[in-house]
Amino acid sequence: MPRSLKKGPFIDLHLLKKVEKAVESGDKKPVKTWSRRSTIFPNMIGLTIAVHNGRQHVPVYVSDEMVGHKLGEFAPTRTYRGHAADKKAKKK
């Protein structure tokens, strides 16, 4: 269920400060964050944000199509290893 329009988009203040600082300085280093719940804002376009997936920080390069989505959508938390193979089918 999407967030109410009257509330507006959410972004953690500490992440917003880091992004503004990176934009001012023109720094190309990834902005490290644990805030997967923050919405991607237009001033983040062109930055690389390292989003934590529970184990490591996944670098996410922000493009204009990503605006309005959450950071966590681009850093998967689960790895799919495939289903168990059928032992009967392997023997034949």
UniProtKB/Swiss-Prot annotation:
Single GO molecular function: structural constituent of ribosome
Keyword vocabulary terms for this entry: Ribonucleoprotein, Ribosomal protein, RNA-binding, rRNA-binding
UniProt record, GO biological process: ribosomal small subunit assembly; translation
One GO location term (cellular component): small ribosomal subunit
Alphabetized NCBIfam families for the sequence: rpsS_bact
HAMAP family for the chain: Ribosomal_uS19 (MF_00531)
Name used for this protein in its record: Small ribosomal subunit protein uS19
Species of origin: Proteus mirabilis (strain HI4320)
Gene name per UniProt: rpsS
